[in-house]
């Protein structure tokens, strides 16, 4: 956790410096005025103007800035993830107890090693990701919680403001990779070896949810986080939670872009139907994934 936040703080500082350079032409006339002849109030007004210009620039490109930060985190967390897997392969991990039989989610003990899973089994994750996203968003829409959460409204404006290709690149691919490397690849995996699946899944999901900064996304991501941890547990490969995360995010982006969510908000009966259908399909996918670990593969998969 410390490394994660340190990287973010350092990168935010560097990003602020870069932003000041980019806006230097606009800020120069303000900064290089006759400061000696200024009153304290006039100087404060100048600094407020500088902060406002820098702040508006950051808000305008907030998703891009978050993606740049995510790329930096991918490099750092990727190295840590690789080192963990290397130690794990060398048998240096510290299990809390005996492992569980294949196909069961253990409460304690080692997580099952990575193993080859047919591509068809990843279609179950596709169904789970789409159904969870639709059902969860419909439930949020029916309760109108999103409209009461100003922090969520601001976050939504940032997420869905840029062009759609930029949304796909940032929110659909890069940010999910950085989040999965940290929350599942490091936090979940490390706690998994010491306190078992349920504790590790809850801790990683809770930290994951609180990082989003608003009630709506916190409720959504704590549920998604538990499913992502479960996918990692059952498939034994980092590719599983990453794929599920990308599917869920892409579903949200596509439905927002096409106006599907707006249409559902105007047709509440259909929203209720989709919430029930999504829950049913998601539950079915969950049960089918439960059987994934029971099928032994001929050869192990690579992380």
Question: What feature does the model see in each segment?
Answer:
Residues 67-72, 165, 169, 219-226, ...:
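Membrane-embedded alpha-helical segments of multi-pass membrane proteins
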Residues 1-2, 122-127, 165-169, 198-203, ...:
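Hydrophobic alpha-helical transmembrane segments
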Residues 69-81, 128-137, 271-291:
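Hydrophobic core of alpha-helical transmembrane segments in multi-pass integral membrane proteins
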Residues 5-87, 120, 124:
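Alpha-helical transmembrane segments in multi-pass membrane proteins
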Residues 246-303:
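C-terminal membrane module of polytopic membrane proteins
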Residues 178-203, 230-237:
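Membrane-interface helix/loop boundary segments of multi-pass membrane proteins
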Residues 5-13, 205, 210, 217-270:
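Functionally important transmembrane alpha-helices
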Residues 22, 26-31, 47-58, 88-97, ...:
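Juxtamembrane helix-loop-helix connectors linking adjacent transmembrane helices
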């Amino acid at each position: 956790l410390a490394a994660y936040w340190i990287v973010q703080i350092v990168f935010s500082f560097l990003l602020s410096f870069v932003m000041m350079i980019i806006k230097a032409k606009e800020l120069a006339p303000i900064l290089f005025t006759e400061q000696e002849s200024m009153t304290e109030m006039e100087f404060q007004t100048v600094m407020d103007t500088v902060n406002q210009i820098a702040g508006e620039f950051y808000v305008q490109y907030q998703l891009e800035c978050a993606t740049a930060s995510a790329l930096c985190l991918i490099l750092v967390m990727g190295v840590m993830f690789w080192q963990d897997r290397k130690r794990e392969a060398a048998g240096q991990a510290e299990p809390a107890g005996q492992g569980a039989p294949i196909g069961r989610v253990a409460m304690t003990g080692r997580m099952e090693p990575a193993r080859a899973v047919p591509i068809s089994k990843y279609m179950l994750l596709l169904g789970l990701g789409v159904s969870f996203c639709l059902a969860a968003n419909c439930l949020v829409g029916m309760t109108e919680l999103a409209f009461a959460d100003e922090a969520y409204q601001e976050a939504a404006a940032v997420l869905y403001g840029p062009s759609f290709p930029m949304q796909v690149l940032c929110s659909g691919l890069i940010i999910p990779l950085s989040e999965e490397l940290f929350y599942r690849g490091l936090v979940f995996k490390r706690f998994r070896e010491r306190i078992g699946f349920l504790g590790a899944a809850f801790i990683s999901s809770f930290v994951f949810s609180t990082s989003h900064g608003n009630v709506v996304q916190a409720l959504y991501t704590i549920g998604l986080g538990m499913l992502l941890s479960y996918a990692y547990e059952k498939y034994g490969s980092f590719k599983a939670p990453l794929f599920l995360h990308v599917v869920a995010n892409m579903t949200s982006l596509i439905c927002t872009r096409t106006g599907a969510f707006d249409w559902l908000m105007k047709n509440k009966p259909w929203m209720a139907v989709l919430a029930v259908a999504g829950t049913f399909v998601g539950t079915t996918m969950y049960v089918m994934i439960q059987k994934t670990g029971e099928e032994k593969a001929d050869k192990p998969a690579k992380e």
